[in-house]
Structures are given as C-alpha cells and as structure tokens.
UniProtKB/Swiss-Prot annotation:
This is Glucosamine-6-phosphate deaminase. Coiled coil: none annotated. It comes from Shewanella woodyi (strain ATCC 51908 / MS32). GO terms for molecular function: glucosamine-6-phosphate deaminase activity; identical protein binding. Pathway: Amino-sugar metabolism; N-acetylneuraminate degradation; D-fructose 6-phosphate from N-acetylneuraminate: step 5/5. InterPro entries: Glc/Gal-6P_isomerase, Glucosamine6P_isomerase, Glucosamine6P_isomerase_CS, NagB/RpiA_transferase-like. It catalyses: alpha-D-glucosamine 6-phosphate + H2O = beta-D-fructose 6-phosphate + NH4(+). Keywords: Carbohydrate metabolism, Hydrolase. NCBIfam families: nagB (TIGR00502), PRK00443.1-4 (NF001684). GO terms for cellular component: cytoplasm.
Length: 264
C-alpha cells in the first residue's frame, strides 16, 4: 500500500481529487467506484470545480457506488442515491443513466445484488474505487467478519455503524439496519483503490489496516492484498502508526522518482 500522510482534511481531499482528475484526464471513459459519507464531500467539491473549469469531463464516465441502505428509495433524503445527486451528479456533466447505486428499494434484493455485479462486469470493471473507512475498519458496509473475497450482497449493520450514522437521521425517522454493499472481493477487483481517512477517531482503524494482521476483523486490512491501493490520511488518522516519519520518507522518495521519470 502507498501511505500518504498530510497535515489536515483539506489536504487529504485535494490530494484525493487530484488522483481522480488525473484518472479522468488519462481515460475520459473511466469507470469510477464512488463512496458516500462526510469524508468524500470535499473531494467531490474539487471535482465539481474542475469540471466547471473544463479541466475534466464526466460525459463518458460510468459510476458505481459502494452501497445503499436497504429499504430506502432513491428519492429518500437519507438514501445514498439522493446524497450522490446532491453532492456530485447534479453539478457535473455526467449522464445520470450511467450512474449506478445499489437499489435500496429492490423487490428482490438478492437478485439485485447479482445484477449489480453483472453491471460492473459489463462496464469492464472499476478503474478506480474511492473508499472511506469506519471506526471498526469497515469499508462500504462490509462490517467485521465479512468474507475477504465476498461479492455484492445484503449485509446487517453493526450497532457501532448504526450509531455512527444516526446523526444523519432525525430522531423519529426510520433508520435502516440492513444494506446492499459491494463485497470486499468486488472492491479488490478495482484496478486502483483510494482510501481517505481523517480524524483521530479513525486512528485505530488505520493502524489495523496498515500494520495489523490480514483479518476479517478489520475488513480494510484486505487492501494489503491490492497491488495499487493508496491510503490518503491526515496526521490525526495516522497518529497511531508506528513510524510516521518513515511513511513520509517513503512517499517523498516515491514523488522524487516519479518526477524524475516524468522528465525522462
């Protein structure tokens, strides 16, 4: 894994946005894997601005989101389809017919999961997958104990995840306890994975992901198996890593090498 440690959340978002800009500039018809939650919002704002400036276009892009609450239609304000429309799709030149979010209101959720996998394969697979990470190391809604080669399926949310997400729901509002999520195996199939994490509350999860054992107890640890995974984290999220200066040194040397290769 490539570990990039930056000062704060603003730098994390900017770095992540630049990765996606370069992807779209080199391959305008990219298949993007997208995520929801508070962490990607600033990254999306950077992409919206770049699109308005004409630096990138989404006209040829196909996208697949990681997950969706089971039981919420896409028009529900707390659904992830609604979130993506508000935070990204409504503000860029993407064809919404090419944007895919697992159907939370599917009559047959199991069949819908199989269909989602088929859609990803039909699109040629995901070129670059954006991830956040939960306090317990979950990616997407792959909670601890998830199979490391799992595919898109229905998952029960842990109490910790339900509590973390409760802030998005009104006190008397129905909050789903089930979801449809890409599996860890589905995520690992992406050609590149970019995980963003900020804040001290993610430090334990980042420690387990980077330096811990490969285990279903920390789903994000599966990224140790990926040949092109980038973790972009701030100082707070990196605070429990054993040798932050070493990771920074590695990244600095990597950037020097890339700069030298770019000139040759």
């Amino acid at each position: 894994m490539q570990i990039v440690i930056l000062k704060n959340s603003a730098e994390v978002a900017e770095y992540g946005a630049n990765i996606f800009k370069k992807q779209l500039q080199s391959k305008p018809d990219s298949v993007l894997g997208l995520a929801t939650g508070s962490t990607p919002v600033s990254l999306y704002q950077g992409l919206i601005e770049a699109n308005k400036l004409g630096d990138i276009s989404f006209k040829e892009v196909t996208s697949f989101n990681l997950d969706e609450y089971l039981g919420l239609a896409g028009t529900h304000p707390q659904s992830y389809r609604y979130f993506m429309n508000e935070q990204l799709f409504d503000h860029i030149d993407i064809d919404k017919a090419n944007t895919h979010v697992p159907p939370g209101d599917a009559e047959n959720p199991i069949q819908a999961c199989d269909g989602y996998e088929e859609q990803i394969q039909a699109a040629g697979g995901i070129d670059i997958q954006l991830l956040g990470i939960g306090r317990n190391g979950h990616i997407g809604f792959n909670e601890p104990s998830s199979g490391l080669m799992s595919r898109t399926r229905v998952k029960t949310l842990t109490k910790a995840t339900i509590e973390d997400n409760a802030r998005f729901f009104k006190e008397d509002e129905y909050q789903p306890h089930l979801s449809i999520t890409m599996g860890i195996g589905t995520i690992l199939d992406a050609k590149k994975v970019v995980l963003l994490a900020t804040g001290e509350n993610k430090a334990d999860a980042i420690l387990a992901t980077v330096e811990g054992a490969l285990t279903a107890s920390c789903p994000a640890s599966a990224l140790q198996l990926h040949k092109n995974a980038v973790l972009v984290i701030d100082e707070a999220a990196a605070s429990k890593l054993s040798d932050r200066d070493f990771y920074k040194h590695i990244e600095a040397e990597n950037q020097k090498l890339l700069a030298r290769l770019a000139k040759s």
